[in-house]
UniProtKB/Swiss-Prot annotation:
It comes from Bacillus subtilis (strain 168). Pfam families: RibD_C. The keyword Transmembrane helix applies. GO terms for cellular component: membrane. One of its GO terms (molecular function) is 5-amino-6-(5-phosphoribosylamino)uracil reductase activity. It is found in: Membrane. SUPFAM superfamilies: Dihydrofolate reductase-like. PANTHER family: 2,5-DIAMINO-6-RIBOSYLAMINO-4(3H)-PYRIMIDINONE 5'-PHOSPHATE REDUCTASE (PTHR38011:SF11), DIHYDROFOLATE REDUCTASE FAMILY PROTEIN (AFU_ORTHOLOGUE AFUA_8G06820) (PTHR38011). This is Uncharacterized protein YwjB. Keywords: Membrane, Transmembrane, Transmembrane helix.
Length: 174
């Protein structure tokens, strides 16, 4: 089975993935069910791709890098500026990079965010599946999941799940 690139992310009802300052503390205030399907999803991937800003937030929020058991890549404009034994830093196009990854044996590839990375991948049609959990809060402002896109992407609903008051939408390319 071919590996897929999967965007797995939470958004507010108004489409924000973080507050304007990049904080995601609003997610901590949400009461769902267990881990809202995260553990089940995490078992389906063996590779995690992060943008530089998200990587830096993760390093601040967690004393131990949380993806040590996965192959982890961070997209950055200056890969030589970073060093981390758990991460490979990348500066190349999303489509070319993921095409190479898909040729390797393995499980799915998690596109973990943030917004700049997601939009770069969207512009290159490099996301195969979208698993988006909508959290019942309207932030009013913040960092939108999708912005400045010019290409239309048609999707087909694969399924939905409810976790307490949150709804998870699973789409594949149409």
């Amino acid at each position: 089975m071919e590996r897929k690139t999967v965007l797995y992310i939470a958004v507010s009802l108004d489409g924000m993935i973080a507050k304007e300052d990049g904080s995601i503390d609003w997610l901590d205030e949400f009461e769902g069910e267990g881990d809202n399907g995260y553990s089940d999803f995490y078992q389906t991937v063996d590779t995690v791709i992060l943008g530089r800003s998200t990587y830096e937030h993760v390093k601040v929020l967690t004393p131990v890098f949380p993806y040590q058991d996965k192959t982890c890549y961070v997209f950055t404009g200056s890969p030589d500026s970073y060093q981390d034994e758990h991460v490979t830093f990348i500066n190349e196009g999303a489509r070319a990079f993921t095409a190479r990854l898909k040729q390797e044996k393995g499980s799915n590839i998690w596109i973990a965010g943030g917004a700049e990375l997601v939009n770069d991948f969207m512009k290159e049609d490099a996301i195969d599946e979208f698993i988006i959990t909508v959290i019942p809060v309207v932030l009013g402002s913040g960092i939108p999941l999708f912005h400045e896109l010019t290409n239309e992407t048609k999707l087909r609903l694969k399924g939905t799940k409810q976790f307490g008051q949150a709804v998870q939408l699973h789409y594949v390319r149409a």
